[in-house]
Regions:
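Hydrophobic alpha-helical membrane-embedded segments
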Residues: 87-112
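Short acidic, glycine/Ser/Thr-rich loop/turn "cap" segments at secondary-structure junctions
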Residues: 84-94, 133, 304-308
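Terminal, membrane-proximal amphipathic helices
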Residues: 1-81, 105-305, 316, 320-324, ...
Length: 356
């Protein structure tokens, strides 16, 4: 069994155990459920900051304990530096293990609050199941990167970009995170090392690592919320945007949706679970180009904006793509659609204005 498969099995078992042992109860009132999800996310973010603080203080404590050695001679100074580096790697590894475990536990508690159906939980062995999507979000893994529905997420990345990506995937998460923090510490030492000891420098760097943990966990929680919300909200958005039924859409509208999703997926470099659910309904893309009229393009753009708002992505490539959609749809209409989706997510307001 490969390490990757072993990690998957551990994550699945951790999620299922947390789900069955959780004291959370399903909350029928969706506004109350949303508040509970907010609390769970906030607590997870706070715990990540505390984990970063404890890890950093442990390293600083070891550095202070070894400080007298550094003044004896060069070999002792080298030994102290090596011990601090090893302590940093071990502490960061334990810290990351705690963060992954805590994310999986939080994912299970969130699923319990929203009362994810048993039939979905029973699909956990399937790669494209709802529990797998939650687990991957909790572990910081991206969505599906293979070709699905005739769309290759990595098609526009280029040969050299693909080579770099393959190289990075071979670097283990724990090792890379430990190395990253070690590099930051070395930079910090170079910057203020002349006016402070190594131990003091590590202590002063503590807020940086706490902030990194908070930012990382906040991103993870947002991704988990997006996938949970998408599970319930996506069918409602589809029904509202296409009251005639997705099977009865015109060829031009289907083609516009496929083209739009292809652009979004290639910009993100992976297929989001919300997109997978929709593409499963749309089926394979028509290889021959289909003429799209103005009304079909407008309906497709409105729907693409809604799904993009649900995913919460906002990097440079997404913003560039969003500007193109806004240009076609208009700033006013784009803002209205986003506000309607935002209200549906956070205030559970029903869709009332026609999108047809």
């Amino acid at each position: 069994m490969s390490k990757k498969e072993g990690l998957k099995i551990w994550a699945i078992n951790r999620f299922l155990n947390s789900f069955s042992n959780s004291n959370e109860v399903p909350i029928i009132d969706r506004l109350e459920a949303d508040k509970r999800l907010d609390n769970l996310c906030t607590l997870a973010i706070i715990r990540s900051g505390l984990a970063g603080a404890l890890s950093g203080m442990l390293i600083s404590l070891i550095a202070y304990a070894l400080e007298p050695w550094e003044e004896i001679g060069k070999s002792e100074k080298l030994f102290a530096g090596l011990m601090i580096a090893i302590a940093g790697i071990v502490a960061t590894s334990i810290e990351l293990l705690f963060l992954y475990r805590d994310s999986l536990t939080t994912a299970a508690r969130m699923a319990k609050v929203l009362d994810i159906p048993d039939e979905e939980l029973n699909k956990i062995e399937m790669e494209q199941s709802m529990p797998r999507w939650l687990i991957y979000a909790a572990m910081g893994a991206p969505g599906h990167r293979g070709t699905l529905f005739g769309i290759n997420p990595l098609e526009k990345i280029g040969k050299y970009g693909l080579m770099v990506r393959k190289l990075l995937t071979k670097i283990r998460v724990i090792g890379s995170a430990s190395l990253f923090k070690s590099i930051l510490r070395r930079i910090w030492v170079r910057m203020i090392g002349r006016v402070a000891t190594r131990a003091t420098v590590n202590l002063l760097a503590l807020p940086v690592f706490i902030l990194l943990n908070i930012i990382g966990m906040r991103y993870t929680m947002n991704e988990m919320r997006s996938r949970l919300v998408g599970f319930e909200l996506t069918p409602k958005v589809i029904k509202h945007a296409f009251p005639e039924g997705i099977d009865n859409l015109s060829p031009g509208l289907k083609y516009a949706l496929h083209t739009g999703f292809s652009e979004q997926i290639m910009a993100a470099r992976y297929i989001h679970p919300n997109q997978i659910r929709i593409l499963e309904m749309l089926g394979e893309m028509n290889e021959s180009k289909v003429l799209i009229n103005e009304d079909e393009q407008r309906r497709a753009d409105r729907f693409l904006i809604a799904i993009s708002t649900m995913s919460g992505k906002n990097n440079y490539r997404h913003r560039k793509l969003s500007r193109e959609l806004e240009k076609r749809l208009g700033n006013k209409e784009t803002s209205r659609v986003r506000n309607e989706v935002w209200d549906a997510i956070h205030d559970l307001k029903p869709f009332e204005r026609s999108w047809k």
